[in-house]
Structure formats: C-alpha cells, structure tokens
Amino acid sequence: MELNKLKLTELVPLISKGEVRPHEIIIDVFKRVQEVEGKVKAYITLTVEKAYDMAREAENAIFSGKKSLLTGIPIAVKDNICTKGILTTCASKILYNFYPPYESTVTSKLLNNKYILIGKTNMDEFAMGSSTENSGFHVTKNPWDLERVPGGSSGGSAAAVAADECIAALGSDTGGSIRQPASFCGVVGLKPTYGRVSRFGLVAFASSLDQIGPITKCVADAALLMNVISGHDPMDSTSAPIESSDFTEYLGKEVKGIKIGIPKEYFIEGMDKEVEERIKDAIKELESLGCIPVEISLPHTEYAVATYYIIATSEASSNLARYDGVKYGLRVQGKDLLEMYMKTRSRGFGTEVKRRIMLGTYSLSAGYYEAYYKKAQQVRTLIKNDFEKAFEKVDFIVTPTAPSPAFKIGEKIDDPLQMYLSDIFTISVNLAGVPAISLPCGFSEKGLPVGLQIIGKPFDEAGILQLAYAYEQSTPWHKMKPLL
C-alpha cells in the first residue's frame, strides 16, 4: 500500500487502530516527493528533518494515549502562512531569508494536533497571481499536464495534493486562490466565510478579502481539516465569534429539495465550451439527486473584476509598505535611507507585485480616491446585496469555478487583463465574504480537470460540504489521478 496516495479520512482510522505509523506515512510521502518534485516543483522549502522529528512526537502522543484528530498526518502549508523558525518567503526575493519568530493560529492548531509539516508550498509572489508563474523562485507545473499552470496563487498546494506529495494542504484565497488551483488540478478547495478561520500569521495581501482554507483530495477531507482550523481567535480582530463545529456530521445527509441557483451572468461568451458542458452535466446530476435548479441573477457580476482589482491593490499597497529592508528580509544598501528603501523594494519585488502596488497607490491618491476606491467599495456593497437577494430564493449557488481548464505556461503572463479574467467566477465570493467550494466535475477532451463551484450563505460551510459530498459520491471524478 502506497500510504501517500490515501486520503486524510482513510489514514485517520488506520493510525487510530495502530495499523499504520506516522513514520511509515512520511517515508512514502518523501519517496513520492523524490520521484515527482523535480517535474512538478510544488514546494519552496521541504522540511525533511523536521518532519521526521514531528513523526516521532506524533508516535509518542499515540503511544501515551494523547492522539488528536490529525496526529501523524503529513500536511503541506502555503508559504505565506507563518511557521515559527521555518523559512516563510511568500515566494518573494524580499523575504528570501525570513524565519518567523511566531506561529500562525492555523499551524498552531495543527501543531496541537501533532500533525507533520512536509514543507512550504510555492505560490504567486505575495499571493498576487492566478498561475504560480509570478513566484520569485520557480514555476510550479500542473500534474495533469506539465506544460500547463496549476492555477494560483495557491498553485503549489493544489499541485502537491494532486500529485500525492502530501495528504492535504493549506492555501489562502483572496480572489479565488484556493478554488481556481483546485479546479485546475482536479482536487477540492474550500474558501471559508470571511472570519471563519483566523488570519493571524497569514502574511497580508488584501486584509478584507484574504481567507485561509483547505485543499484536499476529497470533500470529507476538507470537512475534517475545517474541524481543526476553524473557530474564533482573539489574536485576529476580524475573526468571527463563532466556535468550530463538526463539519463531518452533515456528510451523507439528504439533499432532496435543496434549491440551487444558476446565475445567468456566469454563463458568458468567451467561456470554454467544454467547461460549460461539464457544469451543465453537473447541474443535471444534482437534479437527479433531488435538487431544484432555479435561474437567478447576480446583476453586478460584470463589475466584480474591476471592483476587486481596485480594492485588493489598494489594500496591498498599504500592507506591502512594511517591506523596506530595515527590520527583516532583503536589504540593498544605498547612500541614504530613501535610496535603501527604493533599491530594496525595486530589487525585492517582482513585476506583478510592483504593478499592483502602483495601481493601489494610484487608487488611494488624493485626486482619485473618490473616483476609484470609494466607488469600488460602493459597488462591493451592491455585489454583497446581490448575494443576499439571491439567497432569499435559493439555498446554494452553483457555477463554474474558472472559465477554462488550465492554460499553458506563458500563455497569459504578458497579458495582465487576460490573467485577471481567469478569476471572474471566484472574485465575487471574496467581495461578498461568503463561503464557496470547488470540486472536480469532469474533464476536457485533452484530459484537463474542470471544477464545479458551490457558493453558500455566510457561515454555511456545513451545507456546502453536504451538497458537495452528495455530488462527489454520485460521480467518479474525485477518484481520477494524474499519470506522473
């Protein structure tokens, strides 16, 4: 048995019964990493020695009767989530030597469970991108087709899960950065409600949009990981005062009579025909399970991309002002303080990060604040209202995750607008702060995965997981693996 190929929900009972030891699992995981990492390049940092130490700690906990839910489970963590004493770069040269002096809340919760950290995964620099081509270190490849992108910005996490280089992973989602890579790599990605999972220790991109979530091999694994990472955190002022619940309780429950909204604005010209066909097939499958499709309208969808790129870049220009070479990270010497700031930021940040800082600074400038930033916030409210009105009629909203399957490496990197439009179906969810999941719903003729997005009401992750699980169990797509 190749233990690295098992799901989280398969390994947990095996560890509990003593049939499998954590040490054995990580041997298989690192064997797989050795086989395929040279092709996939999912990781920035592999924590091999640390992983074996953690495996010993996990085994000691098991033998002393102190096993927790995720004890002995190898998990990969996106490289913008702080791990104390372990290199955390955000895939940026400006943080090439940053070892956080503290632990993020989500990894603290995993540590309390005695998990095993496999490594820190590659990403678009500071989570700005949709392809993982903007990494300051290397480009991650899609395990289904090594000439294509894995999506972004959590491309390393999604690729690692798809390639069985870990059992599960954590990502972050600001405008689709968990869901779009999950769609491209044929895995499951959940973006929780804003405030459901603590952001303490997540390196900020856009503070009103960022959210940490799981990337897993199946829906039940996502539910299990959510049990551990969700819940109120006093260290995060935006954390919702809602404690974690058992999300696995809802798996397998009846979905008959559930109303699913189909927004007409999400079936647009320019969308890949095969994606449209797979989504329509998925809607028929949900109908056969007893769900009731209802056509709805989210009328301000057409403004979502513009709204997002004003708000997100404005917040980024403020958040990234702290990287100046003084306290940590890259420092390039200059003849005075101002020159040091300029040289450090010029050499440390990549092209896309510089572009977004400039755009955000422009939007916040005195002459344009009213015309851009303030107006974008007003449109954001309209988008949020669209969802509230829709959820008066339906229980969930079903859409494509992305307008196309994974595109070729280099295909969109020189065309920012085309790259930005690849998040057109995911961005509104972040602007509204609602939860959404992406799960596999078929393949293109070229064998590339297609993702189905299910959007729920605020804090109804349990309902999303219930519906996603029902669909997943009635289809074979989650069982498909890339041939690497």
Curated annotation (Swiss-Prot):
Signal peptide: none annotated. PROSITE patterns: AMIDASES. The active site is at K78, S153, S177. Keywords: ATP-binding, Ligase, Nucleotide-binding, Protein biosynthesis. GO terms for biological process: translation. It comes from the Bacteria. GO terms for cellular component: glutamyl-tRNA(Gln) amidotransferase complex. It is an enzyme of class 6 (ligase). One of its GO terms (molecular function) is ATP binding. Disulfide bonds: none annotated. It catalyses: L-glutamyl-tRNA(Gln) + L-glutamine + ATP + H2O = L-glutaminyl-tRNA(Gln) + L-glutamate + ADP + phosphate + H(+). Its EC number is 6.3.5.7. Belongs to the amidase family. GatA subfamily. Heterotrimer of A, B and C subunits. Allows the formation of correctly charged Gln-tRNA(Gln) through the transamidation of misacylated Glu-tRNA(Gln) in organisms which lack glutaminyl-tRNA synthetase. The reaction takes place in the presence of glutamine and ATP through an activated gamma-phospho-Glu-tRNA(Gln). This is Glutamyl-tRNA(Gln) amidotransferase subunit A. It comes from Thermodesulfovibrio yellowstonii (strain ATCC 51303 / DSM 11347 / YP87).
